[in-house]
Amino acid sequence: MKRGFFPVSALVLSFSFLYSPCNSQVADTWKALPETVAKLSKSQPDFNYSEEKVPAFTLPDLLITSSGRKVTTVKEWMKVRRPEVLELFRENIFGRVPETPYTKSFKIVNEDRNAMNGAATLKQVDITINSEGKSLIIHLIMFVPNKVKKPVPAFLMIDIRGPENNDPTRKIKSEFWPAEEIIARGYAISVFSNSDVDPDNFDEFRNGIHGILDRGVRKPDAWGSLAAWAWGASRCMDYFETDKDINKKKVAIVGHSRGGKTALWAGAEDQRFSLVIANESGAGGAALARRRYGETVARINSAFPHWFCSNYKKFAGNENVMPVDMHMLLALIAPRALYIDCASDDLWGDPKGCYLALYNALPVFQIFDKASMIPDIMPPLNKQAIEGKVGFHIRDGAHNMLLQDWKCFMDFADNVWK
């Protein structure tokens, strides 16, 4: 066995754990339905949906430094190993944010203290970014509960779907962003659109924040759109630090699908987010790349060449030589709180691979908190596995983010923010 790597099958531990219900449904420990596997294998024969065809692989060891030293303390992780891992992801996966100077300003363009029939205050904030005569505006929409003592914890969602999911008038409501239910739980809820920061298409990085901050010829480790959207989330966090209604120590970043990938990278880069929630983030998010199950490194880079840095493309079909895998991305969130969830029909996003990544990130979380331990088997359908600062559930159904998921997020937040 190569130094610094370990087989995932070796991680079998004995411990007590908690299963708590997302809803009233009870099921056995989750496995993909054979009929779902058969259907997807037939309709997408170029991709693997069979556990029997997952290749043998080993994962990079989280706790071995580049010099071969074993990490055993919080100081060693924070001062040595964490910076190493973060740099590996910048260089090989997400890219580096340019150091181009810029200015930012905040302006509340609309405020309604009687929103939601008096339950909340609506604030619409323009976050303006300027650099050398070029500018863009991130439109932040937020609701703050009126009947709760301030400052309050807040959720920030990265919206990848469009205005029908974040209507500030609340004439249009969506489970994807159930603002009323979140306000009723005593949390502030906010959202910005990824397209405000950078367009979700391959425009050779000419528009959005790339068109403002990029200089010269792009390097292989130049930031992609996911890193740009994560950067935008941090600019929203900059605003929260100025708003006396928001508890800046208790802000969660939330994303679905490509937004989930973005939330994970935002949480890795910006430690001000005290809770990171990735909903069905799949390949390039929480799912282990080495499993080659569902969407692969090759496919995601060919379909979405603007999402990651160019260096990521060299691992297409060659995942085993990656210096990282996604358990290392999840470990970058420690010692803050992390919640991962998946959907039973979304095998494209590899639910088992997401759970394995979370499980294999635990050695880092446990350096900080021995209570952060989830079982070595996936929880049953529609049940939560929660211990310490980590949580997981797999919901029945398709690729989406629903009220059922949000209730689980809030239950987890209740625990870690109490």
For the regions a language model picked out, list residue spans one by one.
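Mobile cap/lid helix-loop segments that gate and shape the active-site cleft of serine hydrolases
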Residues: 278-329, 354-375
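N-terminal cap/lid segment of alpha/beta-hydrolase-fold proteins
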Residues: 96-152
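Cap/lid segment of the alpha/beta-hydrolase catalytic domain
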Residues: 150-243, 285-291
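Conserved strand-to-loop "acid loop" that flanks and positions the catalytic carboxylate
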Residues: 334-349, 395-396
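N-terminal pre-domain segments of enzymes
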Residues: 25-94
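C-terminal catalytic histidine-bearing segment of alpha/beta-hydrolase fold enzymes
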Residues: 358-418
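Bacterial N-terminal signal peptides
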Residues: 9-18
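Primarily recognizes the serine-hydrolase "nucleophile elbow" in alpha/beta-hydrolase
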Residues: 162, 166-168, 234-295, 318
